Every structure is written in C-alpha cells, then in structure tokens.
C-alpha cells in the first residue's frame, strides 16, 4: 500500500511599484508498506520435463515499510529598476528542504527438516506445497534471515540561495545568475549483520551553479536562444546504504555500491 500527502501555503506581495515578494512553505509525507511480498523460483528438470523446487531458499517472503517526511520553504524577491527605456531587474531568493526517511525490512525463507522430500519438489508452490497441512515440526517452517544492514534511517538538509539579473536590451534579452547549494546528508545504517550496530555516515556538498540565458527576438513569432546551466545529480539514501533490494527488471537482488556525485 502507498500513502502520499502534499500540502503547501503560498503568498505574493507587491511592495510599492518596483518590488515584489513571494514565498511558500510545504510539508510532504510518503509511505510505502509492503506487508507480505511472496516470491519463488522453480527450475525445469529436463529429464522429467517438470518444474521443480531446487532450493527452498528460493521460496521467500519479505515485509518492508518506508516512511519519509519532507519540510520545505522558499522566498523570492524582485526589484525592478528604471533608467529611461532601460528597465533591468534584480532577483534574489533562498530555499531550504529537510527530509527524514526510515526504512525497515524483514526477510523469511522456507525450510524443511532434513531437506525437502523429492515428492514435494514437483508440487505447485502456491497451490500445493505451501498449504497448511505441510507445515509442522517435521515439515515446512519459516526461518527469518536476520540482516540489520538492510535497515537504515536518513536525513538530508538542503539550503540554497541565488541572485540573478535580467537585462532587456531591445531585441536582445540577457538573464544571468548564480545559485549556491549546501547539502548535508546523514545516513544511519548498521555495520553488523546479526545485531543492531547503528553507524552514522555524513555526506556534505557545496556547489555553485552559474546560468546564462540569451534570447534574441527575430520577429513577433520567432526568437533565437542560447543558454548555459550547470546541474548536479546527488545519490539518494538507498544508493548510499548497504540495503539489498530486489530489482524486477534485472530479476536479481541488488546491493548499492559507492556512489559519486554526477555533474
């Protein structure tokens, strides 16, 4: 099941003839609860041409829950100048966002004392093998595969500010600006498999992002535009954690490797 919520308050203000101010604050919540994902794998026995359960470890159940809270706020200010027919404007603003996430998972496999009997290997897994009559002291039972490294908590604080100017020069319009971002991520994960061992790792980034946009108006319907900008792709919580997750596109379990910031 999934739950999402997004709420926002905004305001716009005109301060005299030359100044404008707008702001917003917001809160978002996201939840993904997977109470019982069941997955099994069978192989084809070429001699009997039957699908068989080769390993009970390939029949498993997973329970996971993810909660994320996001708080944000931003403010933008614009001042318009007037020097005859030349009317440039100055823009400045700030933005901040705080994210907190918690992810927990439990993983179970099936087992059978002294191994799964041959007669049961060819049974249809959901409709025959996993029936209540096959559970017991001398039959099927669930075995939890404890791995604390798959659980993590994290928080991320992003603070940004920018300044820019717009220069209307007849048919030519130039906008130039720069934005600064400070990003600090804390990931709390576990270093030991079989016991709680929370360890914090911090990732801090400071980046400048210049941008220039030049537009030349050819006529009322056409214009020629050149632009330059710089962006960044920072890793997400899951990408820097040691958590293992199942990728349905790859049909395999995936553990995140060390990720670097892409620019």
Regions found by a protein language model. Name each.
Residues 1-89:
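Outer-membrane beta-barrel domain signature, strongest for Gram-negative TonB-dependent receptors
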Residues 2-8, 26, 65-74, 80-263:
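Structural signature of Gram-negative outer-membrane beta-barrels, strongest in the C-terminal barrel
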């Amino acid at each position: 099941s999934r739950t999402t919520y997004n709420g926002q308050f905004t305001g716009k203000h005109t301060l005299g003839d030359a100044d404008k101010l707008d702001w917003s604050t917001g809160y978002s919540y996201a939840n993904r609860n997977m109470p019982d994902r069941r997955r099994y794998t069978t192989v084809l026995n070429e001699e009997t041409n039957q699908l068989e359960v080769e390993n009970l470890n390939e029949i498993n159940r997973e329970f996971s829950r993810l909660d994320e809270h996001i708080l944000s706020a931003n403010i933008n200010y614009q001042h318009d100048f007037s020097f005859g027919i030349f009317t440039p404007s100055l823009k400045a603003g700030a933005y901040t966002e705080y994210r907190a996430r918690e992810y927990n998972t439990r993983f179970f496999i099936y087992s059978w004392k002294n191994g799964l009997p041959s007669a049961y290997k060819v049974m249809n897994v959901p409709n025959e093998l996993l029936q209540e009559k096959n559970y017991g002291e001398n039959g099927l039972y669930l075995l939890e595969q404890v791995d604390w490294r798959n659980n993590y908590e994290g928080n991320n604080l992003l603070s940004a500010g920018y300044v820019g100017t717009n220069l209307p020069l007849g048919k030519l319009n130039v906008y130039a600006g720069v934005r600064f971002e400070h990003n600090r991520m804390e990931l709390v994960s576990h270093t030991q498999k079989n016991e709680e061992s929370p360890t914090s790792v911090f990732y801090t980034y400071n980046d400048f992002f210049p941008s220039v946009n030049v537009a030349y108006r050819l006529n009322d319907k056409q214009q020629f535009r050149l632009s330059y900008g710089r962006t960044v792709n920072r890793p997400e919580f899951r990408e820097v954690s040691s958590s293992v997750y199942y990728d349905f596109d790859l049909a395999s379990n995936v553990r995140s490797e060390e990720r670097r910031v892409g620019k």
